[in-house]
Amino acid sequence: MYTYMEYLQKCFFHATRWNEDNIYSNITASSHALLEFLVPSGLKMDVSSRSSPNSASSFTLSNHHSLNGSLAYMYSSTQLKGTPGTRRIPLQDAIAGFKIVEPNEMRPSASGTIAPSSLLYGRMYFPGAALEAMVIRRFSPHTQLLIKCIHNPQLDKNGTLIAYFQKNTQRYSREVIYSTNDALVGFRGLYNIGSTPSWSPSPPNFDRSVVSVGAELWYAARTMSPGLSTGLRYSTRSTSTGKPLTMTLACNPILGHISSTYTVKTSVASTFCSRYDFNLFSYASNLSLGFELFNFDKNAAVERNPQLPTPTTNPSASKQNLINPIRDHSYYQTTPSTNATTYQSSQTISDSFQKLVNRSEFSSVVKVSTSLNDRLVRLLWEGRFKDFLVSSGVKVSLNPATNAVELNRFGISFSYAS
């Protein structure tokens, strides 16, 4: 579950038309959210408040091993309107999960230009003297500077700083990165094949397949250590059901590591993910599986678009249609005519499925992931209780020596924002 400050940062990117999916570091974000989700440890309470449309503050208190907490403040030069508190925030926006990849969603604003904007963030931890800060400066609709720094007396030279200069367009994205840790210099790039060009006036087609190819290159000047990785992402939608799926392939030639993932949204309320890791040098392999299942809010009904015809289905099958919204809908039946008619029909199906997902209201979600080689299971429940967002989970594994079940992690987290 995102913290409220992380949620506001995503709202800032959305308000300034910045597409996070088009960044190389997020190429496996969907599979990571379903397989490597973080389980809370101990008891944690997070309270946030919006003092104005441009600023927010947050207070966090936890008792993991010892009592500690933090104070955070965020300021945005762009007003973050339409950002509700935890009582009204959609559960899909508050939780990291499957993300439909749409490189074309980065469209210009109504005025055609985006004014330069900034976001400032700082957090102070106690007890101790640890500090962290972040600065985001948008120079143009396609370029921004992101700076992150940490000050901690326990770190080498009391802290580190990392800067990203990013250029993000519909066709490609590039990043130049520098870190004071070992004088690390890096370059990342991602290129989309099959997306609509930036000069095209046509709107994006949600059912169009997009192939994204990227790579990153690192070099640590102090230790003279190189780093290299490549990645490929294929995103598409089923023309018969409109359900999206994403496949990725990542490779680290230096370490000989290959990782492939397959993530599919099997229904409006469920997503399945699998990942297979293999090492070319040691021949070690691992299979990881995970899924998420949302629970519909019984007190909220799914809104329908009045412009769409009413489907000719049995009312008793309405709950079943939420699992497969395309079945039994005569409006979505396609007829084998011309290619243009078939394309428009498949586009309507994809668009209808996406609208149903966006308009569905959920009360909670259950996430489960397991790894065969690591022999561990993660279980996480996230949902809404009164005006709070609650996250509770457990992580268990088998002891390799005794085969006994061990409890590695357990906790519960409460989040409130007004």
From Swiss-Prot:
Keywords in alphabetical order: Membrane, Mitochondrion, Mitochondrion outer membrane, Transmembrane, Transmembrane beta strand
TM annotation in the entry: none
Pfam family name, one: MDM10
Main localization, broad class: mitochondrion
GO cellular-component term (any): SAM complex
Topology of the protein relative to the lipid bilayer: Multi-pass membrane protein
GO biological process, one term: phospholipid transport
UniProt cross-references to InterPro entries, sorted A to Z: Mdm10
Subcellular location per the Swiss-Prot or TrEMBL entry: Mitochondrion outer membrane
Keyword Kinase: no
Biological role: Component of the ERMES/MDM complex, which serves as a molecular tether to connect the endoplasmic reticulum and mitochondria. Components of this complex are involved in the control of mitochondrial shape and protein biogenesis and may function in phospholipid exchange. MDM10 is involved in the late assembly steps of the general translocase of the mitochondrial outer membrane (TOM complex). Functions in the TOM40-specific route of the assembly of outer membrane beta-barrel proteins, including the association of TOM40 with the receptor TOM22 and small TOM proteins.
Assembly and interaction partners: Component of the ER-mitochondria encounter structure (ERMES) or MDM complex, composed of MMM1, MDM10, MDM12 and MDM34. Associates with the mitochondrial outer membrane sorting assembly machinery SAM(core) complex.
PANTHER family named among the record's database cross-references: MITOCHONDRIAL DISTRIBUTION AND MORPHOLOGY PROTEIN 10 (PTHR28035:SF1)
Family named by the database record: Belongs to the MDM10 family.
Comment on protein domains: Lacks alpha-helical transmembrane segments, suggesting that it resides in the membrane via beta-sheet conformations similar to those predicted for other outer membrane proteins and porin.
Full protein name: Mitochondrial distribution and morphology protein 10
Source organism: Meyerozyma guilliermondii (strain ATCC 6260 / CBS 566 / DSM 6381 / JCM 1539 / NBRC 10279 / NRRL Y-324) (Yeast)
